[in-house]
Amino acid sequence: MTAASTSNAQTFGLGPTSFSTAALREVSRRELIQVLDSVRGKKALVIDPSVSGPLSLVAEFAVLKEHGVEKIFHLASAPLETDCKSLVYITRPNPTHMKWIADQYKWCASQRSSTPDNQPDITVYFVPRRTLICDQILEEQGIFGDIAIGDYHLDIVPLEEDLLSLELDSFKPFYVDGDPTLIHSVAHAIMKFQILYGSIPRILGKGNGAKVLTELLIRMRRDYSIADAPLNSSQASDSEFDSIIILDRTVDLVSPLRVQLTYEGLIDELFSIKTTFVEISAPVSQVSPAAIIPPTYSKSKKLVLNNQDHVFSEIRNLGFEVVGSMLSHVALRIQEEEDERHKLKTTTQLKDFASKIGGLQQQRQSLGLHNGIYDDILRYAGNPDTVKRWAAEEVFTHGKSSSSDLEYIEELIGRQAPIETVLRLLCLYCVVNGGLKTKYYDSFRRHIVQVSEWLFAYLAMR
């Protein structure tokens, strides 16, 4: 779900907008503080890794520390070794996680004396809300009555001033497994948005999922009047959004199957961007001769990629082939601004320049970082195997593929290319051509089993 920012709105001729995500951030921050304060004293915070990124955009570690958090752990299957009596879990309603929490509770209880004062005090908060399945698993594990349970409604995550995300990895559960939980989560998030920013009168949608969501939103509006929300009347009546457009993912399955060719898109392809964060460091090897395999890195450093990085904001949406010239332009601009110091004559001019020094230094540091990343992208993009893959994607997309193009996929399987690369190409072909002929399906299945028996067994189990 997106909303136009001032810069983007002007780009598309929509005029400026005063929309700000500050209210969303503040609501999520206040609720997080309530979650932490619900458990008195010192505590350990155990976070589902998929929630860690969104949480870091809401509150800094200093805020957690102020409200009693002594240690932070990522939720995993291993026993949780900590001296903290109080444990606060913040997790998605994942059935596997419920078993891990139960195992950790039992392990902690076994390591301490049997007196009630020494038993672990566990509180589980679900993001964005609990499910009956999770309750049932906790009951089956025998700990449902021994722990406290609540919800933390971190359902809308502001990634940028013009980009909001639910951060839900729910394509398979919704489209393959038929789990309707996603629709309810999206509906609650949109209602929350309207409570904060005013009612959106017009709903437009395309796709079956969009239709179901629209009908649910209409029912929720009847059951709950946004005018009754805890806002002042000007907020409720003066919403700057007159429409919401809902697009079902199945409307366009081709785009996510193709390699992204913008600068930001290729960073995501090579390094994987998670909630605006990416881990990048100096490569320990050049790009693989088979460019279908990204370069390997060591001593990774976590970076934030958003519009607060002025260099990144200028190049993120550009095609990678023109990024080099833009980086040169940015370098020249920074140099010209730094050279202005030689022309300064008055005290006022000196003070104005001094106020810019910090920003110029940050931009120069950012420029060096993006020059390094761009070099990696060029090595990857210039490899003949990468070019061959992109050419195959282009052919598949236009429905002009032949048996020789399918042989290219067989070649990738034989070279033990990453299974994601193989499956993306196969899925792209199937989406455009309405599936695979039986003889091709049997051939691909046989090759995958022969080359990667362990992988096929893993996929079969899932």
Regions found by a protein language model. Give the residues of each.
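Extended, well-folded catalytic/binding cores that form a central cleft or groove in large enzyme
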Residues: 1-462
